[in-house]
UniProtKB/Swiss-Prot annotation:
NCBIfam families membership: efp, PRK00529.1
PANTHER family, per the entry: ELONGATION FACTOR P, ELONGATION FACTOR P (EF-P) FAMILY PROTEIN
Cellular-component GO terms for this entry: cytoplasm
Role, per record: Involved in peptide bond synthesis. Stimulates efficient translation and peptide-bond synthesis on native or reconstituted 70S ribosomes in vitro. Probably functions indirectly by altering the affinity of the ribosome for aminoacyl-tRNA, thus increasing their reactivity as acceptors for peptidyl transferase.
Source organism: Trichodesmium erythraeum (strain IMS101)
Gene3D superfamilies: 2.30.30.30, Nucleic acid-binding proteins (2.40.50.140)
GO molecular function: translation elongation factor activity
Family per record: Belongs to the elongation factor P family.
Name the UniProt record assigns to this protein: Elongation factor P
GO biological process: peptide biosynthetic process
SUPFAM superfamilies in the cross-refs: Nucleic acid-binding proteins (SSF50249), Translation proteins SH3-like domain (SSF50104)
Pfam families: EFP, EFP_N, Elong-fact-P_C
Signal sequence segment: none
Top-level taxonomic group: Bacteria
Amino acid sequence: MISSNDFRPGVTIELDGSVWRVVEFLHVKPGKGSAFVRTKLKNVQNGNVVERTFRAGETVPQATLDKRAMQHTYKDSDQFVFMDMETYEETNLSSEQIGERVKYLNEGMEVNVIMWGEQVIEVELPNSVVLEVIETDPGVKGDTATGGSKPATVETGAQIMVPLFISKGERIKIDTRNDSYLGRE
């Protein structure tokens, strides 16, 4: 159990049979009446965001999440197969369970799978990945690093904006948190 006074961004709680992550909180002490905590909560299973108010000191169950290191081994039709790095058990996940980060998932990549009981809540990719550019407009003599950017498609099918000097076949480092180009590899 966790007190509403201990809420911080990132804390996970259980409400109404779901897991919620505290996005924002505000402790309010009105001049008259008792204090309360106004929160913005995000459902980690479906992404819904709600605002909810708790009395100061009210206790709610804290969600116990388990982080497991897994490796993406292969893709089987619309299922992605992951192997637990400790037990070597295989787990199948759909692209809906992985979310929008599926565009950076490459075979052999190690990820953290966040579980609530036996239910997969989230797949955490590394902060950056190195992928090969398979399609982009050719670079033209005179293009500079400060010039601008152009779209490029990487080996997983994701499209990101890269500097004009990047050409097909180069390996680039990409930030998976904000889809940005970090540099050549």
